[in-house]
Design a protein with these regions (language model features):
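Active-site helix-to-loop segments that bind/position phosphate- or nucleotide-bearing substrates
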Residues: 1-154, 159-173, 192, 201
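Flexible, glycine-/charge-rich segments associated with ATP-binding catalytic modules
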Residues: 50, 142, 160-244
Length: 244
């Protein structure tokens, strides 16, 4: 909370001079009566899922049909948004395969099949921009690994922006404006910002995939859910189109 307050105070003279309770109210963390808002609980609460169980992540590796098991490493992640981001990226790191590569000295090293930056950005995007309305109250962010695809699905579709605009400098729109503003001032345990606050997460994922020589991310919006797909391997998986 101290780090959040310090970051917020740097943005405005009025906020710099306000009491802590005022800062939290003006930033939408607390209501006027001092209770946590939904955005505040989700972003900064100790256990948001105790209030709304859907404010979590379900992740699993989907196995090939015909086997005894349908999934591997099925987890239900809980905690405030920054912790969800850390847990989900760690889960991805242990389940996405690595390729053999070499460092500048010629030493053999393991290189992840997908750029970690792209993985982190699509997860952060799903967490920050998921719909929080009652219609999606029973829906979690879902992460799946299916063959050579990393799939992240969040409740709710795009608002104020089209699929074609994703990644464009002017193609940004916060589904949850209050949550977005809160997250601009939050960091994970390793000191990284949850979001940069410039709407560049999708663009960063696109650049990371291109730099790795991989297919562009694929995005799908069907109104009730938004899906981002990252694929490793040179050829697009069957039934997929490359993103723009």
């Amino acid at each position: 909370l101290d780090a959040f307050e310090t970051s917020v105070r740097r943005t405005s003279r009025r906020l710099a001079e306000a009491e802590r309770a005022e800062v939290l109210r003006w930033m939408g963390v607390l209501t006027k009566s001092g209770e946590a808002t939904l955005a505040g609980m989700y972003a900064m609460g100790r256990f948001p899922q105790g209030w709304r169980p859907s404010l979590g992540i379900t992740a699993a590796v989907r196995l090939s049909a015909g086997g005894e098991r349908r999934t591997h490493d099925l987890v239900h992640l809980t905690g405030p948004l920054p912790e969800l981001l850390e847990q989900a990226t760690a889960w991805a790191a242990r389940n996405i395969p690595a390729d053999m590569g070499y460092d500048a000295a010629g030493n053999g090293i393991d290189l992840p099949a997908l750029p970690p930056r792209a993985i982190r950005e699509v997860i952060a995007n799903a967490l920050v921009h998921r719909n929080l309305d009652a219609v999606t109250e029973s829906k979690r962010v879902e992460i799946r690994i299916v063959r050579n695809r990393f799939i992240v699905t969040s409740p709710g579709g795009l608002v104020g922006v089209s699929l074609r605009q994703l990644g464009d400098p002017d193609g940004k729109s916060a589904v949850n404006a209050t949550l977005y503003e809160i997250c601009k001032h939050l960091r994970t345990e390793d000191g990284q910002r949850v979001i940069e606050g410039e709407g560049g997460g999708i663009r960063e994922a696109q650049h990371a995939m291109a730099a790795a020589g991989l297919p562009a991310p694929v995005f799908r919006d069907v109104g009730l859910r938004f899906t981002a797909i990252l694929q490793w391997g040179r050829e697009p998986a069957e039934g997929l189109e490359r993103g723009r």
